[in-house]
Amino acid sequence: MRSRYGSDGSDQASLQVNAATAVARLMPSARVVDATLWYIALQGVMSYAASGWVKLLGRPWRQGTALSGVMRTSTYGHDGAWRFLQKHPKFEHIATAGLLVFESAYPLVYLAGPRVGALVSLSAMSFHVLNGVVMGLGRFVWGFAAFHPAILYTTHRQSARSGGYLLPIASASLLAAVVGVIQIAALHRRRLVLDGPPFRENLETRSGNVLNYGGKLKGASVLVVMENALFATQEHYGWITSALDRADDVDFITYDRAGYGASRLNAAKNRTGQYLIDDSVEDLVSLVSTLHKPGQRLVLVGHSFGGEIIRRAARRIPSEVLVGIVLIDSTHPSQFASSALQSEGLQLIRDGQAQVGTIVNLGFGSLMERPEWVEQLPRRFRRIANNQYRDGRMWTAGRREIDAIARELDIEEPPQLEKLPHTKVSIISASRTMEDPDAGRMQVEMAEYYGAAHAHSIFKATHDSLLTDPLVAVRVAGVILDLACTTEEAK
Protein backbone atom coordinates (compact mmCIF):
# COMPACT_ATOMS: atom_id res chain seq x y z
CA MET A 1 0.00 0.00 0.00
CA ARG A 2 1.37 3.42 -0.95
CA SER A 3 0.80 6.48 1.20
CA ARG A 4 2.11 10.04 1.33
CA TYR A 5 2.41 9.76 5.12
CA GLY A 6 5.98 10.25 6.22
CA SER A 7 6.87 12.40 3.22
CA ASP A 8 7.46 15.58 5.24
CA GLY A 9 9.03 16.64 8.51
CA SER A 10 5.79 16.98 10.45
CA ASP A 11 4.92 13.33 9.80
CA GLN A 12 8.38 12.22 10.83
CA ALA A 13 8.30 14.33 14.00
CA SER A 14 4.89 12.95 14.96
CA LEU A 15 6.06 9.39 14.34
CA GLN A 16 9.11 9.83 16.58
CA VAL A 17 7.07 11.34 19.41
CA ASN A 18 4.19 8.87 19.17
CA ALA A 19 6.47 5.84 19.02
CA ALA A 20 8.47 6.96 22.06
CA THR A 21 5.41 7.86 24.13
CA ALA A 22 3.84 4.50 23.24
CA VAL A 23 6.90 2.77 24.70
CA ALA A 24 6.61 4.89 27.85
CA ARG A 25 2.93 3.98 28.18
CA LEU A 26 3.59 0.27 27.75
CA MET A 27 6.49 0.26 30.23
CA PRO A 28 5.55 2.93 32.80
CA SER A 29 8.68 2.82 34.94
CA ALA A 30 10.49 6.04 35.88
CA ARG A 31 13.66 5.03 34.04
CA VAL A 32 11.83 4.12 30.84
CA VAL A 33 9.82 7.35 30.89
CA ASP A 34 12.99 9.35 31.50
CA ALA A 35 14.78 7.58 28.65
CA THR A 36 11.94 8.13 26.20
CA LEU A 37 11.74 11.82 27.09
CA TRP A 38 15.47 12.15 26.47
CA TYR A 39 15.03 10.35 23.15
CA ILE A 40 12.23 12.71 22.07
CA ALA A 41 14.20 15.77 23.18
CA LEU A 42 17.39 14.79 21.37
CA GLN A 43 15.43 13.99 18.21
CA GLY A 44 13.88 17.45 18.36
CA VAL A 45 17.14 19.26 19.08
CA MET A 46 18.98 17.47 16.27
CA SER A 47 16.14 18.10 13.81
CA TYR A 48 16.64 21.84 14.26
CA ALA A 49 20.43 21.57 14.19
CA ALA A 50 20.54 19.37 11.08
CA SER A 51 18.19 21.75 9.29
CA GLY A 52 20.50 24.65 10.04
CA TRP A 53 23.67 22.79 9.05
CA VAL A 54 22.20 21.75 5.71
CA LYS A 55 21.06 25.32 5.01
CA LEU A 56 24.62 26.53 5.62
CA LEU A 57 25.75 24.50 2.61
CA GLY A 58 23.37 26.37 0.29
CA ARG A 59 24.69 29.50 -1.42
CA PRO A 60 21.31 31.34 -1.34
CA TRP A 61 21.12 30.83 2.43
CA ARG A 62 24.65 32.11 2.95
CA GLN A 63 23.92 35.10 0.70
CA GLY A 64 20.71 35.87 2.57
CA THR A 65 18.39 35.50 -0.43
CA ALA A 66 16.82 32.08 0.22
CA LEU A 67 13.67 33.32 1.97
CA SER A 68 12.47 35.37 -0.99
CA GLY A 69 13.23 32.39 -3.22
CA VAL A 70 10.93 30.21 -1.12
CA MET A 71 8.24 32.89 -0.98
CA ARG A 72 8.02 33.06 -4.79
CA THR A 73 7.33 29.32 -5.23
CA SER A 74 3.86 28.05 -6.02
CA THR A 75 4.00 25.37 -3.30
CA TYR A 76 5.13 27.31 -0.22
CA GLY A 77 5.12 30.88 -1.47
CA HIS A 78 3.22 33.91 -0.22
CA ASP A 79 2.85 36.91 -2.50
CA GLY A 80 2.62 39.47 0.30
CA ALA A 81 5.68 38.10 2.09
CA TRP A 82 7.64 37.99 -1.16
CA ARG A 83 6.81 41.62 -1.96
CA PHE A 84 7.79 42.67 1.56
CA LEU A 85 11.16 40.92 1.29
CA GLN A 86 11.78 42.47 -2.12
CA LYS A 87 11.22 45.93 -0.64
CA HIS A 88 13.31 45.24 2.48
CA PRO A 89 16.37 43.18 1.47
CA LYS A 90 18.26 44.08 4.65
CA PHE A 91 15.47 42.58 6.72
CA GLU A 92 15.72 39.38 4.66
CA HIS A 93 19.48 39.19 5.24
CA ILE A 94 19.06 39.68 8.99
CA ALA A 95 16.18 37.19 9.20
CA THR A 96 18.10 34.58 7.20
CA ALA A 97 21.22 34.97 9.32
CA GLY A 98 19.16 34.78 12.50
CA LEU A 99 17.45 31.59 11.35
CA LEU A 100 20.77 29.96 10.46
CA VAL A 101 22.27 30.79 13.85
CA PHE A 102 19.12 29.77 15.73
CA GLU A 103 18.85 26.35 14.08
CA SER A 104 22.55 25.51 13.83
CA ALA A 105 23.26 26.37 17.47
CA TYR A 106 20.17 24.68 18.91
CA PRO A 107 22.10 21.92 20.77
CA LEU A 108 23.71 24.65 22.93
CA VAL A 109 20.38 24.88 24.76
CA TYR A 110 21.77 22.23 27.13
CA LEU A 111 24.61 24.54 28.14
CA ALA A 112 22.40 27.61 28.61
CA GLY A 113 20.09 26.45 31.38
CA PRO A 114 16.31 26.00 31.74
CA ARG A 115 15.31 29.67 31.51
CA VAL A 116 17.10 30.17 28.22
CA GLY A 117 15.73 26.80 27.11
CA ALA A 118 12.18 28.01 27.72
CA LEU A 119 12.83 31.17 25.67
CA VAL A 120 14.33 29.09 22.86
CA SER A 121 11.30 26.77 22.81
CA LEU A 122 8.96 29.78 22.76
CA SER A 123 10.93 31.23 19.84
CA ALA A 124 10.80 27.92 17.99
CA MET A 125 7.04 27.66 18.40
CA SER A 126 6.58 31.25 17.22
CA PHE A 127 8.64 30.35 14.17
CA HIS A 128 6.39 27.36 13.39
CA VAL A 129 3.22 29.40 13.83
CA LEU A 130 4.60 32.01 11.42
CA ASN A 131 5.41 29.26 8.91
CA GLY A 132 1.91 27.90 9.31
CA VAL A 133 0.37 31.26 8.45
CA VAL A 134 2.73 32.26 5.63
CA MET A 135 3.68 28.93 4.05
CA GLY A 136 0.62 26.86 4.89
CA LEU A 137 2.61 24.43 7.03
CA GLY A 138 0.01 24.15 9.77
CA ARG A 139 0.81 20.52 10.52
CA PHE A 140 4.37 21.49 11.44
CA VAL A 141 3.06 23.52 14.38
CA TRP A 142 1.60 20.46 16.09
CA GLY A 143 4.25 18.03 14.87
CA PHE A 144 7.16 20.01 16.30
CA ALA A 145 5.28 21.35 19.33
CA ALA A 146 5.32 17.79 20.67
CA PHE A 147 9.11 17.91 20.96
CA HIS A 148 9.25 20.89 23.29
CA PRO A 149 7.81 19.49 26.54
CA ALA A 150 10.55 16.86 26.38
CA ILE A 151 13.19 19.48 25.57
CA LEU A 152 12.09 21.60 28.55
CA TYR A 153 12.09 18.53 30.81
CA THR A 154 15.61 17.52 29.80
CA THR A 155 17.07 21.01 30.10
CA HIS A 156 15.73 21.18 33.68
CA ARG A 157 17.05 17.71 34.45
CA GLN A 158 20.44 18.58 32.99
CA SER A 159 20.79 21.77 35.06
CA ALA A 160 19.75 19.93 38.24
CA ARG A 161 22.50 17.34 37.94
CA SER A 162 25.78 17.88 39.73
CA GLY A 163 27.74 16.76 36.70
CA GLY A 164 26.16 19.30 34.41
CA TYR A 165 28.50 18.58 31.51
CA LEU A 166 28.13 14.81 31.64
CA LEU A 167 25.42 14.68 28.97
CA PRO A 168 27.30 16.84 26.43
CA ILE A 169 30.44 14.76 26.92
CA ALA A 170 28.56 11.46 26.63
CA SER A 171 26.63 12.70 23.61
CA ALA A 172 29.82 13.91 21.92
CA SER A 173 31.50 10.55 22.55
CA LEU A 174 28.55 8.66 21.09
CA LEU A 175 28.43 11.01 18.12
CA ALA A 176 32.16 10.53 17.50
CA ALA A 177 31.72 6.76 17.54
CA VAL A 178 28.83 6.92 15.06
CA VAL A 179 30.77 9.27 12.78
CA GLY A 180 33.73 6.88 12.92
CA VAL A 181 31.59 3.96 11.77
CA ILE A 182 30.11 6.08 8.97
CA GLN A 183 33.59 7.12 7.79
CA ILE A 184 34.80 3.52 7.74
CA ALA A 185 31.79 2.63 5.60
CA ALA A 186 32.63 5.55 3.28
CA LEU A 187 36.22 4.31 2.84
CA HIS A 188 34.98 0.81 2.04
CA ARG A 189 32.47 2.19 -0.45
CA ARG A 190 35.19 4.30 -2.14
CA ARG A 191 37.32 1.19 -2.59
CA LEU A 192 34.41 -0.68 -4.20
CA VAL A 193 33.75 2.24 -6.55
CA LEU A 194 37.40 2.57 -7.59
CA ASP A 195 37.82 -1.16 -8.14
CA GLY A 196 34.76 -1.30 -10.38
CA PRO A 197 32.81 -4.46 -11.19
CA PRO A 198 34.87 -7.43 -12.44
CA PHE A 199 33.07 -7.60 -15.79
CA ARG A 200 34.49 -4.23 -16.92
CA GLU A 201 37.90 -3.14 -18.18
CA ASN A 202 40.05 0.00 -18.19
CA LEU A 203 41.45 1.95 -21.12
CA GLU A 204 43.92 4.85 -21.03
CA THR A 205 43.08 7.64 -23.46
CA ARG A 206 45.47 9.96 -25.26
CA SER A 207 44.93 12.56 -22.52
CA GLY A 208 46.14 10.15 -19.84
CA ASN A 209 42.69 9.67 -18.35
CA VAL A 210 41.64 6.09 -17.59
CA LEU A 211 38.12 5.11 -18.65
CA ASN A 212 36.27 2.14 -17.15
CA TYR A 213 34.09 0.51 -19.80
CA GLY A 214 31.95 -2.53 -20.45
CA GLY A 215 29.65 -3.95 -23.07
CA LYS A 216 29.60 -6.54 -25.83
CA LEU A 217 32.49 -6.65 -28.30
CA LYS A 218 32.09 -9.67 -30.59
CA GLY A 219 32.94 -8.10 -33.92
CA ALA A 220 29.37 -7.33 -35.04
CA SER A 221 28.85 -5.10 -38.06
CA VAL A 222 27.56 -2.15 -35.97
CA LEU A 223 29.09 -0.70 -32.79
CA VAL A 224 26.89 1.44 -30.51
CA VAL A 225 28.70 3.66 -27.98
CA MET A 226 26.64 5.29 -25.21
CA GLU A 227 27.40 8.57 -23.42
CA ASN A 228 26.02 9.38 -19.97
CA ALA A 229 24.20 12.43 -18.63
CA LEU A 230 25.42 14.72 -15.85
CA PHE A 231 25.70 13.06 -12.44
CA ALA A 232 25.10 9.70 -14.10
CA THR A 233 27.05 6.51 -14.71
CA GLN A 234 26.88 3.70 -17.24
CA GLU A 235 24.54 1.70 -15.02
CA HIS A 236 21.75 4.02 -16.17
CA TYR A 237 21.85 2.29 -19.56
CA GLY A 238 21.15 -1.10 -17.97
CA TRP A 239 17.76 -1.71 -19.56
CA ILE A 240 18.89 -0.46 -22.97
CA THR A 241 22.01 -2.63 -22.99
CA SER A 242 19.89 -5.63 -21.98
CA ALA A 243 17.89 -5.11 -25.17
CA LEU A 244 20.98 -4.50 -27.33
CA ASP A 245 22.62 -7.61 -25.91
CA ARG A 246 19.94 -9.73 -27.58
CA ALA A 247 20.72 -8.28 -31.02
CA ASP A 248 23.29 -10.47 -32.79
CA ASP A 249 24.34 -7.85 -35.34
CA VAL A 250 25.10 -5.08 -32.80
CA ASP A 251 28.03 -4.59 -30.41
CA PHE A 252 27.83 -1.90 -27.73
CA ILE A 253 30.01 -0.02 -25.25
CA THR A 254 29.09 1.89 -22.10
CA TYR A 255 31.67 3.76 -20.07
CA ASP A 256 32.12 6.34 -17.35
CA ARG A 257 33.73 9.68 -18.05
CA ALA A 258 36.92 10.49 -16.17
CA GLY A 259 36.17 11.05 -12.48
CA TYR A 260 33.01 8.93 -12.41
CA GLY A 261 32.94 5.38 -11.05
CA ALA A 262 36.22 3.56 -11.63
CA SER A 263 37.32 6.00 -14.38
CA ARG A 264 40.19 8.23 -13.28
CA LEU A 265 41.44 11.66 -14.22
CA ASN A 266 45.03 12.22 -15.24
CA ALA A 267 46.37 13.44 -11.88
CA ALA A 268 48.88 15.91 -13.35
CA LYS A 269 46.35 17.50 -15.71
CA ASN A 270 43.70 17.64 -13.00
CA ARG A 271 46.01 19.72 -10.81
CA THR A 272 46.99 22.22 -13.47
CA GLY A 273 44.10 22.56 -15.93
CA GLN A 274 40.47 23.63 -15.90
CA TYR A 275 37.99 21.07 -17.20
CA LEU A 276 36.49 21.77 -20.63
CA ILE A 277 33.61 19.97 -22.30
CA ASP A 278 35.99 19.15 -25.16
CA ASP A 279 38.13 17.14 -22.73
CA SER A 280 35.33 14.58 -22.53
CA VAL A 281 34.85 14.78 -26.30
CA GLU A 282 38.52 13.92 -26.85
CA ASP A 283 38.28 10.99 -24.44
CA LEU A 284 35.25 9.65 -26.32
CA VAL A 285 37.04 9.94 -29.67
CA SER A 286 40.08 8.18 -28.18
CA LEU A 287 37.89 5.39 -26.78
CA VAL A 288 36.20 4.87 -30.15
CA SER A 289 39.46 4.86 -32.11
CA THR A 290 40.87 2.19 -29.80
CA LEU A 291 37.89 -0.18 -29.56
CA HIS A 292 36.27 0.30 -32.97
CA LYS A 293 37.18 -2.49 -35.39
CA PRO A 294 37.92 -1.83 -39.08
CA GLY A 295 34.77 -2.05 -41.17
CA GLN A 296 32.38 -1.55 -38.25
CA ARG A 297 29.68 1.09 -38.60
CA LEU A 298 29.51 3.38 -35.57
CA VAL A 299 26.41 4.79 -33.85
CA LEU A 300 26.77 7.23 -30.93
CA VAL A 301 24.02 7.55 -28.30
CA GLY A 302 23.91 10.43 -25.79
CA HIS A 303 21.47 11.20 -22.99
CA SER A 304 21.07 14.82 -21.83
CA PHE A 305 24.57 16.35 -21.49
CA GLY A 306 25.87 13.21 -23.20
CA GLY A 307 24.04 14.40 -26.31
CA GLU A 308 26.17 17.56 -26.40
CA ILE A 309 29.32 15.45 -26.11
CA ILE A 310 28.44 13.05 -28.95
CA ARG A 311 27.27 15.93 -31.14
CA ARG A 312 30.73 17.49 -30.84
CA ALA A 313 32.48 14.14 -31.23
CA ALA A 314 30.56 13.49 -34.45
CA ARG A 315 32.55 16.30 -36.10
CA ARG A 316 35.84 14.57 -35.24
CA ILE A 317 35.09 11.01 -36.31
CA PRO A 318 35.45 10.10 -40.01
CA SER A 319 32.10 10.08 -41.82
CA GLU A 320 32.86 6.68 -43.32
CA VAL A 321 32.93 5.31 -39.75
CA LEU A 322 30.16 7.27 -38.00
CA VAL A 323 26.81 6.60 -39.63
CA GLY A 324 24.34 7.80 -36.99
CA ILE A 325 23.76 9.50 -33.65
CA VAL A 326 20.84 9.22 -31.24
CA LEU A 327 20.11 12.26 -29.06
CA ILE A 328 18.03 11.26 -26.02
CA ASP A 329 16.47 14.36 -24.44
CA SER A 330 19.70 16.06 -25.38
CA THR A 331 21.14 19.32 -24.15
CA HIS A 332 20.85 22.08 -26.76
CA PRO A 333 23.96 24.31 -26.85
CA SER A 334 21.83 27.47 -26.78
CA GLN A 335 19.21 26.42 -24.24
CA PHE A 336 20.68 28.36 -21.32
CA ALA A 337 21.52 31.49 -23.29
CA SER A 338 18.11 31.68 -24.96
CA SER A 339 15.93 30.88 -21.94
CA ALA A 340 16.05 32.70 -18.61
CA LEU A 341 14.16 29.83 -16.98
CA GLN A 342 16.66 27.26 -18.25
CA SER A 343 19.55 29.41 -17.04
CA GLU A 344 17.93 29.82 -13.63
CA GLY A 345 17.29 26.09 -13.51
CA LEU A 346 20.97 25.42 -14.20
CA GLN A 347 21.94 27.63 -11.26
CA LEU A 348 19.44 25.88 -8.99
CA ILE A 349 20.91 22.52 -9.98
CA ARG A 350 24.41 23.79 -9.24
CA ASP A 351 23.35 25.00 -5.80
CA GLY A 352 21.46 21.82 -4.96
CA GLN A 353 24.19 19.48 -6.14
CA ALA A 354 26.79 21.53 -4.25
CA GLN A 355 24.90 20.91 -1.00
CA VAL A 356 24.55 17.19 -1.59
CA GLY A 357 28.11 16.92 -2.87
CA THR A 358 29.51 18.57 0.24
CA ILE A 359 27.66 16.15 2.51
CA VAL A 360 28.78 13.12 0.51
CA ASN A 361 32.39 14.31 0.18
CA LEU A 362 32.52 14.66 3.96
CA GLY A 363 31.85 10.93 4.10
CA PHE A 364 28.17 10.97 5.07
CA GLY A 365 26.80 9.27 1.97
CA SER A 366 25.53 6.42 4.17
CA LEU A 367 22.90 8.80 5.55
CA MET A 368 21.38 9.46 2.13
CA GLU A 369 18.21 7.64 1.17
CA ARG A 370 18.46 5.05 -1.57
CA PRO A 371 17.00 6.88 -4.60
CA GLU A 372 13.97 5.46 -6.36
CA TRP A 373 15.70 5.33 -9.74
CA VAL A 374 18.25 2.86 -8.34
CA GLU A 375 15.43 0.42 -7.59
CA GLN A 376 14.23 0.77 -11.19
CA LEU A 377 17.54 -0.42 -12.67
CA PRO A 378 18.23 -4.07 -13.52
CA ARG A 379 19.08 -5.96 -10.34
CA ARG A 380 22.74 -6.58 -11.22
CA PHE A 381 23.40 -2.82 -11.43
CA ARG A 382 21.56 -1.60 -8.34
CA ARG A 383 24.30 -2.05 -5.75
CA ILE A 384 26.92 -0.56 -8.07
CA ALA A 385 24.77 2.48 -8.81
CA ASN A 386 23.85 2.98 -5.15
CA ASN A 387 27.52 2.91 -4.08
CA GLN A 388 28.39 5.48 -6.73
CA TYR A 389 25.46 7.69 -5.71
CA ARG A 390 26.66 7.70 -2.10
CA ASP A 391 30.32 8.26 -3.00
CA GLY A 392 31.78 11.72 -3.46
CA ARG A 393 33.51 11.01 -6.78
CA MET A 394 30.29 11.19 -8.79
CA TRP A 395 29.30 14.50 -7.19
CA THR A 396 32.77 16.01 -7.66
CA ALA A 397 32.88 14.98 -11.32
CA GLY A 398 29.35 16.27 -11.89
CA ARG A 399 30.16 19.59 -10.26
CA ARG A 400 33.25 19.94 -12.47
CA GLU A 401 31.11 19.35 -15.55
CA ILE A 402 28.21 21.58 -14.57
CA ASP A 403 30.67 24.41 -13.90
CA ALA A 404 32.03 23.91 -17.42
CA ILE A 405 28.49 24.04 -18.82
CA ALA A 406 27.94 27.35 -17.03
CA ARG A 407 31.21 28.76 -18.42
CA GLU A 408 30.82 27.48 -21.98
CA LEU A 409 27.07 27.37 -22.65
CA ASP A 410 25.39 29.80 -20.24
CA ILE A 411 26.90 32.81 -22.03
CA GLU A 412 25.65 35.51 -24.39
CA GLU A 413 27.09 33.86 -27.52
CA PRO A 414 27.10 30.09 -26.99
CA PRO A 415 28.25 27.61 -29.65
CA GLN A 416 25.69 26.78 -32.31
CA LEU A 417 24.43 23.54 -33.78
CA GLU A 418 26.61 22.28 -36.64
CA LYS A 419 25.54 20.24 -39.63
CA LEU A 420 26.37 16.55 -39.85
CA PRO A 421 25.83 16.01 -43.59
CA HIS A 422 26.80 12.33 -43.75
CA THR A 423 25.33 11.22 -40.43
CA LYS A 424 21.77 10.14 -39.71
CA VAL A 425 20.23 11.69 -36.61
CA SER A 426 17.48 10.28 -34.40
CA ILE A 427 16.02 12.46 -31.66
CA ILE A 428 14.13 11.04 -28.70
CA SER A 429 12.27 13.35 -26.33
CA ALA A 430 10.29 12.64 -23.18
CA SER A 431 6.68 13.82 -23.20
CA ARG A 432 7.35 15.66 -19.93
CA THR A 433 10.18 17.57 -21.62
CA MET A 434 7.96 18.51 -24.54
CA GLU A 435 5.37 19.94 -22.14
CA ASP A 436 7.90 22.59 -21.07
CA PRO A 437 7.69 25.45 -23.59
CA ASP A 438 11.41 26.24 -23.67
CA ALA A 439 12.75 22.69 -23.45
CA GLY A 440 10.21 21.46 -26.00
CA ARG A 441 11.13 24.24 -28.41
CA MET A 442 14.80 23.24 -28.21
CA GLN A 443 13.99 19.61 -29.01
CA VAL A 444 11.91 20.66 -32.03
CA GLU A 445 14.66 23.01 -33.21
CA MET A 446 17.26 20.22 -33.14
CA ALA A 447 14.96 17.89 -35.05
CA GLU A 448 14.29 20.53 -37.72
CA TYR A 449 17.95 21.57 -37.96
CA TYR A 450 19.23 18.05 -38.50
CA GLY A 451 16.26 17.02 -40.59
CA ALA A 452 15.95 14.10 -38.22
CA ALA A 453 14.29 11.25 -40.07
CA HIS A 454 13.40 9.75 -36.72
CA ALA A 455 12.06 12.20 -34.15
CA HIS A 456 10.22 10.48 -31.32
CA SER A 457 8.30 11.89 -28.36
CA ILE A 458 7.74 9.09 -25.89
CA PHE A 459 4.44 9.35 -24.03
CA LYS A 460 4.37 9.23 -20.22
CA ALA A 461 8.15 9.53 -19.99
CA THR A 462 10.36 11.86 -17.99
CA HIS A 463 13.94 12.93 -18.62
CA ASP A 464 15.26 10.15 -16.37
CA SER A 465 12.69 7.42 -17.04
CA LEU A 466 13.78 7.30 -20.68
CA LEU A 467 16.60 5.14 -19.34
CA THR A 468 15.49 3.85 -15.95
CA ASP A 469 11.91 2.73 -16.65
CA PRO A 470 12.14 -0.72 -18.29
CA LEU A 471 8.98 -0.24 -20.36
CA VAL A 472 10.16 3.13 -21.67
CA ALA A 473 13.80 2.09 -22.11
CA VAL A 474 12.88 -0.83 -24.37
CA ARG A 475 11.23 1.67 -26.72
CA VAL A 476 14.38 3.80 -26.69
CA ALA A 477 16.43 0.69 -27.44
CA GLY A 478 14.11 0.01 -30.36
CA VAL A 479 14.90 3.42 -31.86
CA ILE A 480 18.63 2.76 -31.47
CA LEU A 481 18.32 -0.65 -33.13
CA ASP A 482 16.22 0.81 -35.95
CA LEU A 483 18.95 3.34 -36.71
CA ALA A 484 21.67 0.69 -36.45
CA CYS A 485 19.79 -1.65 -38.80
CA THR A 486 19.04 1.19 -41.24
CA THR A 487 22.71 2.09 -41.47
CA GLU A 488 23.58 -1.56 -41.99
CA GLU A 489 21.11 -1.88 -44.86
CA ALA A 490 22.50 1.29 -46.44
CA LYS A 491 26.05 -0.06 -46.61
Per-range role (PLM):
Residues R257-V301, I317:
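Active-site loop/oxyanion-hole signature of alpha/beta-hydrolase fold enzymes
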Residues E448-K491:
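Catalytic active-site module of serine/aspartate enzymes centered on a nucleophile-bearing elbow/loop
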Residues G44-V45, A49-F102:
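Membrane-interfacial catalytic/cofactor-binding modules of polytopic membrane enzymes
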Residues G295-S339:
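Conserved hydrolase catalytic core segment
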Residues I325-I359:
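Flexible "cap/lid" loop of the alpha/beta hydrolase fold
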Residues N386-Y449, S457:
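Conserved serine/cysteine hydrolase catalytic core
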Residues K216-R264:
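Conserved HGGG/HGGXW glycine-rich cap/lid loop of the alpha/beta-hydrolase fold
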Residues R206-K216:
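A short loop-to-beta-strand scaffold at the N-terminal edge of the catalytic core in hydrolase folds
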